[in-house]
From Swiss-Prot:
Note: Toxic segment of the protein is located in the N-terminus.
Protein name (Swiss-Prot/TrEMBL): Pesticidal crystal protein Cry3Ba
Function, in words: Promotes colloidosmotic lysis by binding to the midgut epithelial cells of Coleoptera.
Organism this protein belongs to: Bacillus thuringiensis subsp. tolworthi
Taxonomic lineage: Bacteria, Bacillati, Bacillota, Bacilli, Bacillales
An example molecular function term from Gene Ontology annotations: toxin activity
Record-stated family: Belongs to the delta endotoxin family.
UniProt-listed Pfam families: Endotoxin_C (PF03944), Endotoxin_M (PF00555), Endotoxin_N (PF03945)
InterPro entries to which the protein is assigned, alphabetical: Galactose-bd-like_sf, Pest_crys, Pest_crys_dom-III, Pest_crys_dom_I, Pest_crys_N_sf, Pest_cryst_cen_dom_sf, Pest_cryst_dom_II
Calcium recorded as keyword: no
Amino acid sequence: MIRMGGRKMNPNNRSEYDTIKVTPNSELPTNHNQYPLADNPNSTLEELNYKEFLRMTADNSTEVLDSSTVKDAVGTGISVVGQILGVVGVPFAGALTSFYQSFLNAIWPSDADPWKAFMAQVEVLIDKKIEEYAKSKALAELQGLQNNFEDYVNALDSWKKAPVNLRSRRSQDRIRELFSQAESHFRNSMPSFAVSKFEVLFLPTYAQAANTHLLLLKDAQVFGEEWGYSSEDIAEFYQRQLKLTQQYTDHCVNWYNVGLNSLRGSTYDAWVKFNRFRREMTLTVLDLIVLFPFYDVRLYSKGVKTELTRDIFTDPIFTLNALQEYGPTFSSIENSIRKPHLFDYLRGIEFHTRLRPGYSGKDSFNYWSGNYVETRPSIGSNDTITSPFYGDKSIEPIQKLSFDGQKVYRTIANTDIAAFPDGKIYFGVTKVDFSQYDDQKNETSTQTYDSKRYNGYLGAQDSIDQLPPETTDEPLEKAYSHQLNYAECFLMQDRRGTIPFFTWTHRSVDFFNTIDAEKITQLPVVKAYALSSGASIIEGPGFTGGNLLFLKESSNSIAKFKVTLNSAALLQRYRVRIRYASTTNLRLFVQNSNNDFLVIYINKTMNIDGDLTYQTFDFATSNSNMGFSGDTNDFIIGAESFVSNEKIYIDKIEFIPVQ
């Protein structure tokens, strides 16, 4: 789906979904003892009831992050990625000016300044400031880039609208001049977004500027000949584009890792900040650089159907800052997150509920104490995968919610507390609404985990505040950016409660591995439904949009896949291309259920002790074509024998229509 609307902002410069506000994180007033009842030993819990306690804690409530700044930056990042995903590949040249106009409205809107928001976002995330001289210079450069890019887009629009026989030499010279000015301005301005000591702080700014530069450079390949550029000039632009794609990608990944590693710590609070940086830089930087290779129109000569399979984590559902010292440790949370695995889909959650008694029977509530998760592998397997148990098992009735076939695009979780005269406070999640969408039936519905017993209402956490929609021009069930994929619980120290948190994946993930009849279809290798014992899934390097397959020994069947094709796609034949990195030359093969057998030769791209960088990945293409019959649309990837110490990484498989 092509989304041209961008993000509509309300008069307060907030997304309209922002009006669905959650109660801010609460913390105890600094002029009170940490435990309010201890301030006045003559107070009783009856005198200091729940509402009074909540009023006291709300007097000094603060949001850890400025939600307006963060949501504006994250929302812009999500919107830009969503727009580009809908149009990547050469066919979008036909609607290029309308895309550019929508794109310009996203990154340079008339009623907001996303670039300032990008800078402020990282300042908050890592608690550092950009020096005023560096910020002012960067903003001035961005203003110049906007002017140049808008002039070029207007000229391109006029050029494309003019009949070919009415295009003059003067107009040809003019658009070449404006293209060259804009391109050179980007090239000369990029160092202003990579100022020494501020590389991490400028990271989203750098990524967005780099993306715009590469989008622009692509046009030399699409229009260069009709603009009157020589073949040598066009080739020079192409080589520059390839070089800068590598340079920009490596810069973003390197400084993302520097920033992330600087936030590693030992406490619960440190993990929350670490994870926020990881999530928001994924949405504004890493998701964007995944798209850079698609601007190579010689490699992607058709439209592209692709998907982002990476996981991101919303904040733990925990709204009381006074209890942060009782949260799980940094390492216990990070180590409990699922290790890299084949992609799977949320099938259901089994909730366990426990009673949290209040003082003298008052202020008692039930809470989400633990859970199992059921998932299913990618299409091709009917297995159900049951997770380990997370949290505390219960003696209360168990509640199961089934999401099979539904896409959960929003969660709203309510929380509660119980306070005791000795100052102890206990926390729990009492209710969660899961908004879901069945895109096959075009139906929306809501399922609810309900503990059935509440004390009051401390606050709520709405996933939309952290994962805004791609656009506000459509209903949320159509415009959502992410879908729920997993749920875990962590036990608080001193038995103070349980903290759940959710894992999400991008909306572009295709449940059915659908092969397009006209576009190049990218199938991430993690969408296989089975692996051989000689293969495993490892963490991706940051620029692939997901994890990788690591091959440690040869096998006739490294990975098994099932795909879906409509009648037009079944009539098509496809050349197969694999994106990989390898320390050795090797012969791979692809065989489908029609017994089409394709051989793919891969060459060494890296040394045995080398790191995975953009340059270490290459493409290898099959020596012939394959088709599918429609009866059983399965295929396997295999590999001939190789020395066991060698390393082979596979990122994606591409099906390129040839008819």
